[in-house]
């Protein structure tokens, strides 16, 4: 009898130990979320319709093409080319996402014949007048924050993220819900230094495209101003064989055929 009881207890201990050994840490969850959000395939392309709606109801629409290229070392390159409306036509935005150091960002303003470098300190400012930020285009590096798993349900991991350099950002922390099946962040709540929630970014629709879970509708909300920006992604493609040479400054002025 004692031997049976001992065997049952041993089995229970082993099962608990086994489940603990497979439990993901907050850092591992965030790393997988970063991969799911920004690294699907070797490269990618999408058409984007951006709708900016002010609190009073005024609506502005922007249409652009986004390209992404993954380097073998984890670095990435992003190219955004604006097609409409007329005031942003032929404007281009280039990002070199660098692992372990500040990203490089350039904005081409054809109306002014001006190539503008976006300083690292400006990465969390408005992207072309929308409620999305420059940093949202290429993603925030997981290394910039301390991550804590604060809740786990059957469907999501809830992670609290605190910046390692509080003076470099406008938020005190943000809480993100990550889908346990796809590892896509579904909603992020941003809090200011007084503890008030002032911003939300949410994935409103997810589809499987070429085997990759893909956000096809996302929304950023400025809770202080009441402004809302919705991005609708279409014609999404992965592994299309993009050439890294198009992700250079010379193609800011001369957009490659891949975006036209």
Regions found by a protein language model. Name each.
Residues 83, 94, 104-108, 114-117, ...:
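Gly/Pro-enriched, hydrophobic low-complexity segments
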Residues 248-259:
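Short, low-complexity, Pro/Ser/Thr/Gly-rich segments in the mature regions of secreted, periplasmic
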Residues 70-76, 149-156, 208-211:
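Short, ordered beta-strand-loop transition motifs
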Residues 19-23:
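Sec/Tat signal peptide C-region and signal peptidase I cleavage site
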Residues 27-28, 60-62, 136-148, 195-200:
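A short, amphipathic edge element
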Residues 26-111:
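N-terminal mature ectodomain segment of secretory-pathway/periplasmic proteins
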Residues 7-18:
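Bacterial N-terminal signal peptides
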Residues 1-6:
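Positively charged n-region of N-terminal signal peptides that target proteins for export
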């Amino acid at each position: 009898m004692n031997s049976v009881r001992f065997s049952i207890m041993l089995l229970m201990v082993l099962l608990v130990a086994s489940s603990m050994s497979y439990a993901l840490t907050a850092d591992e969850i965030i790393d997988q979320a970063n991969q799911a959000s920004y690294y699907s395939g070797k490269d990618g392309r999408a058409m984007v319709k951006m709708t900016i709606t002010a609190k009073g109801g005024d609506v502005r629409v922007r249409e652009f093409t986004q390209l992404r290229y993954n380097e073998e070392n984890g670095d990435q390159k992003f190219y955004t080319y604006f097609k409409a409306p007329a005031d942003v036509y032929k404007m281009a935005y280039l990002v070199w996402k660098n692992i372990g150091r500040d990203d490089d960002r350039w904005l081409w303003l054809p109306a002014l014949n001006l190539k503008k470098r976006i300083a690292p300190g400006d990465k969390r400012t408005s992207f072309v007048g929308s409620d999305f930020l420059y940093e949202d285009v290429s993603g925030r590096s997981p290394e910039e924050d301390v991550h804590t798993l604060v809740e786990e349900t059957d469907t999501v991991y809830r992670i609290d993220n605190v910046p390692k350099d509080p003076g470099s950002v406008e938020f005190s922390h943000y809480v993100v819900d990550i889908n346990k099946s796809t590892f896509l962040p579904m909603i992020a709540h941003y809090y200011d230094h007084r503890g008030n929630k002032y911003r939300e970014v949410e994935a409103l629709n997810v589809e499987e495209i070429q085997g990759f879970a893909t956000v096809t509708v996302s929304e950023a909300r400025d809770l202080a101003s009441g402004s809302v920006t919705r991005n609708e992604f279409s014609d999404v493609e992965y592994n299309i064989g993009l050439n890294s040479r198009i992700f250079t400054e010379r193609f800011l002025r001369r957009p490659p055929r891949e975006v036209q």
